Curated annotation (Swiss-Prot):
Family per similarity comment: Belongs to the TFB1 family.
Gene: tfb1
One Pfam family, short name: BSD
Binding partners and assembly: Component of the 7-subunit TFIIH core complex composed of XPB/ptr8, XPD/rad15, ssl1, tfb1, tfb2, tfb4 and tfb5, which is active in NER. The core complex associates with the 3-subunit CTD-kinase module TFIIK composed of mcs2/cyclin H, mcs6/cdk7 and pmh1/tfb3 to form the 10-subunit holoenzyme (holo-TFIIH) active in transcription.
One of the GO BP terms on file: DNA repair
PROSITE patterns: BSD
Domain BSD, chain residue ranges per copy: 116-169, 190-241
Gene3D superfamilies: 6.10.140.1200, Pleckstrin-homology domain (PH domain)/Phosphotyrosine-binding domain (PTB) (2.30.29.30)
An example Gene Ontology molecular-function term: RNA polymerase II general transcription initiation factor activity
Name of the molecule in the record: General transcription and DNA repair factor IIH subunit tfb1
Cellular compartments annotated: Nucleus
Principal place of residence: nucleus
């Protein structure tokens, strides 16, 4: 926000000062607290009189509550010194402040709104619902049958799927972080020729993650064709180095790519870490002592010179990916500096802080401890609790052993047979229809009818159990939807009969669903037969 701007203005026939800093304020003459204090995001419109009008005033429209008409506040500058100049100054500064406020609110990431989504916003977010239906074909089919055919309203359908909408909103707000693109590209050999498929985004990411590759590309393309360059690169030792793979003597040589094997890919930059003093630079002192004394580490502790370049390359790539994800924030540098200062201090030489505890002294403490404890009258006649040995002796005879349990082999065999038969029937229905070779189109119709009917039953019982006495207007469409489901089952049975399939098979598969429909309608009619209390 800019500097504070203020000017004399009249509000409701009272003289005062109109000021703009972080908010729009008007303070009456002789008062310290502002009578008008308005946030910039509450201002919906701004009007001012033209220069030809002798009256100089500003009309500010503010929104007190969402959905209500804006309220106007009028500030007059007529009769004050430099009225027109002050009016223009206040108007321009107020417009700039409102513009900055709106730009700041729009620049916030969309992911921050995910935590604030509630049930009402989810049910009204049509774009989110369309995205979820596009990604879930089964849910889309159910939506078409239940909502688009007029059986359920859009709010009823989504009221039972708020968890799906909320999870999808969180999924959409997440952004994919950077990854090692080069390791995901796998060239293929077709007709003794290597083929590689690259997109523009992949090439851009590789150049951003590997500055050395961008340097080689800019230097040799042209004269090399782009296809030839990428074919030679993916077969070269340079590609294996950037990937972090070990280079072997069997790898083919390339007179262009091999010249860059010893080049360091790390970009030179100014280090944010302070230079360590020789007084407590343990790593530097250790290296210096080894050089002077000509000491070499044990063979198990020596660095593998062949693996060292690959380790450095992978570490540098990981560092670049992290910097891109974190935005190279200075906050981490400040944390590292504070940690460095804490670790470099000689804390063992600091004076110990004195304990500021309060010592509690009791007069006559010895006399209190020497007095014999005399039980009260209520405690004299009580018997002590039995000992643990006495309790164990009481329950020693009736001990329980979990190793000897009576098994009903017939019941176990029957349960296992029923479970196996159920799993076999489910597998046969999902793969081949039924044992009687039910056509696949009939099977799909049955599955869809069952799914939609379950949705109707869910909504039906939610509305029925929501109140003590059901609402006829709300229950009538749901009852009709259940009755239409029974008619649809009859239509599927007729369709099966036309294809020389026994209709009894269809009724057997949906028998539980039909029973649920009859039970629901009977319960609704039973409740409607009782008058409301």
């Amino acid at each position: 926000m800019g500097d504070r701007v203020e000017a004399l203005a009249i509000f409701r026939k009272k003289q005062g000062v109109l000021s703009i800093d972080s908010r729009l304020k008007w303070t009456g003459e002789g008062k310290t607290t502002p009578s008008v204090d308005i946030a910039f995001d509450a201002i919906s419109n701004l009007q001012t009189t033209p220069a030809s009008n002798p009256k100089v005033m500003i009309r500010v429209f503010i929104v007190v509550k969402e959905g209500e008409d804006p309220t106007s506040l009028v500030f007059h500058f007529t009769g004050t010194p430099n009225a027109r100049e002050n009016c223009d100054m206040i108007t321009n500064e107020l417009r700039n402040a409102i513009q900055r406020q709106r730009e700041g609110s729009q620049s916030k990431p969309q992911g921050a709104n995910v935590d604030r989504v509630n049930s009402t916003n989810l049910e009204k977010d049509i774009d989110l619902q369309e995205s979820l239906l596009t990604n879930n074909p089964d849910l889309l089919q159910t939506f078409k049958e239940a909502v688009m055919k007029g059986h359920l309203s859009n709010e009823q359908f989504w009221s039972t799927r708020l968890h799906l909408l909320r999870a999808h909103a969180v999924e959409r707000s997440q952004q994919r972080g950077p990854y090692n693109v080069l390791s995901t590209i796998k060239p293929k050999t077709v007709d003794n020729q290597m083929k590689v498929s690259l997109t523009g985004q992949q090439i851009h990411d590789m150049f951003e993650q590997h500055p050395l590759l961008r340097k080689v590309y800019d230097k040799h393309v042209p004269p090399l064709a782009e296809g030839e360059f990428w074919s030679r690169f993916f077969l070269s030792k340079l590609c294996k180095k950037l990937r972090g793979d070990r280079i072997t003597p069997m790898d083919p040589s390339d007179d262009i790519m091999d010249k860059y094997l010893k080049d360091n890919e790390e970009v030179t930059k100014v280090s944010d870490e302070p230079i360590a003093s020789h007084l407590f630079d343990l790593e530097g002192n250790d290296q210096n002592a080894n050089v002077i004394a000509e000491l070499r580490p044990d063979i198990t502790m020596r660095i593998d010179k062949e693996a060292l370049p690959f380790m450095k390359n992978i570490n540098q790539l990981s560092e670049r990916l992290l910097e891109k994800s974190l935005g190279n924030s200075k906050r981490f540098n400040n944390e590292n500096e504070e940690t460095y200062l804490k670790e470099s201090g000689f804390h063992d030489l600091e004076e110990e802080a004195s304990d500021s505890k309060v010592v509690l002294k009791i007069k006559g403490q010895d006399q209190l401890l020497e007095n014999n404890f005399v039980p009260s009258k209520n405690q004299v006649g009580l018997e002590p609790l039995p000992s643990l040995e006495a309790l164990q002796h009481l329950y020693q005879e009736d001990s329980i052993s979990l190793n000897h349990i009576e098994h009903d082999s017939d019941s176990l065999a029957e349960a296992a047979m029923q479970l196996t038969q159920s799993m076999r029937e489910k597998h046969e229905f999902e793969t081949h229809g039924t044992a009687s070779n039910l056509p696949i189109d009939i099977k799909n119709e049955i599955v869809l009818c069952h799914t939609v009917t379950i949705e109707f039953l869910h909504q039906f019982w939610n509305a029925l159990l929501n109140t003590t006495f059901p609402d006829k207007k709300a229950m009538a469409p749901l009852q009709n939807a259940l009755l239409n489901s029974k008619k649809r089952v009859e239509a599927i049975a007729s369709q099966a009969q036309e294809q020389n399939v026994d209709p009894k098979l269809v009724y057997e598969l949906v028998s539980c669903t039909l029973t649920s429909i009859d039970t629901s309608i009977s319960e609704y009619q039973r409740r409607m037969s009782y008058p409301p209390a």
